[in-house]
Amino acid sequence: MHRTTRIKITELNPHLMCVLCGGYFIDATTIIECLHSFCKTCIVRYLETSKYCPICDVQVHKTRPLLNIRSDKTLQDIVYKLVPGLFKNEMKRRRDFYAAHPSADAANGSNEDRGEVADEDKRIITDDEIISLSIEFFDQNRLDRKINKDKEKSKEEVNDKRYLRCPAAMTVMHLRKFLRSKMDIPNTFQIDVMYEEEPLKDYYTLMDIAYIYTWRRNGPLPLKYRVRPTCKRMKISHQRDGLTNTGELESDSGSDKANSPAGGIPSTSSCLPSPSTPVQSPHPQFPHISSTMNGTSSSPSGNHQSSFANRPRKSSVNGSSATSSG
């Protein structure tokens, strides 16, 4: 699972700013021929003297370039949601303009054009905004009963719900810590904050939750929580204990091997013969000749030599024959 990376707004600025005025998009407008976007007033003023895109020089239209530009509401909503305070400042500028110029014709414009749209109506949330939320214990059994029975809320369900007012920038991790300290939940239990039946990430802010789940401000943001044992941590601790014990056993056996006479010899079974297997000579044609290892002569034990004790042995050494008896 890939870790989520949070990036700075400055890294997105090239995609959110108009190259003509150097500011963030206001009334974002896109050229349909090349899909480059600009502020509406900026591109309209530019196309009065040119018929080419100011970025890629593609021809917008031969005679009437304004026919090939479109308002981009989606891009403008993204800019308003990403740039803190931009929407509120723009609405204030428009209200101040029409207050200073009463003769300006704004009758055909929308409420947003006149600056009369509040943040709540546009569903724009700022970091310093206070969000009302409700949080209650998530009970699967109660949820099943609620599906099977009537949807009337009992007094017990109402009393289990708590209401909070928190900054929009507060994260789920902060809410989890608050619940743990408020209810004295030990660290051996895990707290999950949920929206409906879906657990939320620790790095989610209340503003993120409101945007992701399209909170309409028609009531407190409904959140739930559940408490469960930290099974994964317990398993990891057991595995570590097992590895530690195994390491201790191996170290103990290693120390025993170091103190034993065979400590310097590898313990691999494929390298050494078993006690019941006779030691094979490196010279199969002369099984009685001992082999030399590390400058010392190693010969079979007395039990293996007894079968050759009374048998004469003849071997050729340096071209001369030698006969030896047991």
From Swiss-Prot:
Residues 164-228 are annotated as: Interaction with E4F1. Component of a Polycomb group (PcG) multiprotein PRC1-like complex, a complex class required to maintain the transcriptionally repressive state of many genes, including Hox genes, throughout development. PcG PRC1 complex acts via chromatin remodeling and modification of histones; it mediates monoubiquitination of histone H2A 'Lys-119', rendering chromatin heritably changed in its expressibility. The complex composed of RNF2, UB2D3 and BMI1 binds nucleosomes, and has activity only with nucleosomal histone H2A. A motif (Nuclear localization signal) lies at residues 81-95. Residues 236-326 are annotated as: Disordered. Induction: Down-regulated by oxidative stress. Keywords: Chromatin regulator, Cytoplasm, Metal-binding, Nucleus, Proto-oncogene, Repressor, Transcription, Transcription regulation, Ubl conjugation, Zinc, Zinc-finger. GO terms for cellular component: cytosol; heterochromatin; nuclear body; PcG protein complex; PRC1 complex; ubiquitin ligase complex. It comes from the Eukaryota. It is found in: Nucleus; Cytoplasm. A zinc finger (RING-type) spans 18-57. It comes from Bos taurus (Bovine). This is Polycomb complex protein BMI-1.
